[in-house]
Amino acid sequence: MSGYNYIFSNIKNANQISQGKKAVSSLGVKAVGKYKLVVQLENPEPTFIDKMVMPAFYPQNTRLVKKYGAKYGTAAKYTAFDGTFKVTKWTNTSEKWTAVKNPYYYAKSAVKLQKLNYQVVKDSNTAHQLFQQGSLDDAVVSGTTAQGLQNNKNLYHLYRSGNNFVNLNMAKGAVLANKQLRQALYLAVNRTQLSKKVLADGSKPSYTFSAPNAAKDPASGKDFATAAQPKETYNVAKAKKLWQAGLKQLSKSKLDLTLVASDTTTDKNVSEFLQSQLESKLPGLKVTVKNLPPKSAYNLAANGKFDLYLSFWINDYADPYSELQTLEMTNSHNYGKYTSAAYNNELSQARKNAATRSVYFSHLLKAQEQMNQDYPVLPLYTMVEDHLVNANLKGVLWHKVGIVDYTRAYFK
């Protein structure tokens, strides 16, 4: 969970403890009796309760943690469960496992399912076949399989509050520290073509780092991502001029950029599309694509060994801040080393004024608008999950933020 340290930052003394400047005992958290937790915050934060459903905040059974030591959490028998279901037949290498109804769950009478069988299916075509055979009641499909099923009566589009985008390496000395080159890249990508022709799975073009379906801007009543969208999103002629001006500033006539992405079918297709789009529209540009296993691609990004990095983010809670904070200067997810005092200041002001919703969102909007001027990332398309769902399966909560919830699910 080290990559999520920042979500604790508003808890009293959390930052100082993380930096080794204060003792853990000074953390602004304490248990009052068996059923009450008191948390002291540095600043007001209306969405803090929403954050508490994230796994990073889950309580741990101290007795079991000490008992199992390094084995804790590596298999079902070394893990404690206090939710609707408890997991059985699982190890950290399992591709199949079962969740059975928890007899100690406080609202067990409202839970109709006795168990859920999970199966890892790496190929969408296989997932489709298993669904047709009746072996799966909820099957996630993507790529060409999803494209061919867009008119299927069992297909459900789950539009997540998430975006797929390209991180641009802006570190000191990197060629993309040049703003004109970054703006040229942004304006050269035909996102409509990407979503409709390449992905063709229900995805929609994305023009801001802030993902849709997180929250509405109280001033305009619009989805925050729509309210924050820049006016100009695609202009090839302008992109060429900016590109040539940027090259001139760097005393270059051509440029080689490396695009790092995972080796999933979707990321391969998106990588090829970006390579073609950028090379054909920006004179003197060569894009070398490196499709690697996700962990290997991430390691390169985390160590700054990329020019372009195809990535994504799903909001952890229903607030644009969830995503925007990942590009603050000190955030561990800021792989491209975006550095903007104005951007950071707006987020800081948002935190200080979080108790007043209108003021809070006005600062978030200004932060996104600042990013629109700086081009630290290339937003590409919104995140959609295509699910084949048993027509008799009811009561599932399809959350745009968070995980799919089967707590009250049942079969008709």
Spans of model-derived segments:
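Aromatic- and charge-enriched surface segment that lines or borders ligand/interaction sites
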Residues: 1-10, 38, 175-177
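Gly/Pro-rich hinge or "lid" segments in bacterial periplasmic/extracellular proteins
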Residues: 12-16, 22-24, 41-111, 115, ...
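Extracytoplasmic/peripheral linker and loop segments enriched in polar/acidic and small residues
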Residues: 21-25, 231, 284-297, 324-390, ...
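Alpha-helical secondary-structure segments
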Residues: 34-38, 114-115, 163-209, 255-265, ...
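Ligand/substrate-recognition segments at binding pockets and active sites
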Residues: 92-94, 236, 244-315, 330, ...
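Ligand-site clamp/hinge motif
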Residues: 101-149
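Structural transition elements
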Residues: 204-245, 266-268
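Long beta-strand-rich cores associated with HINT superfamily self-processing modules
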Residues: 387-412
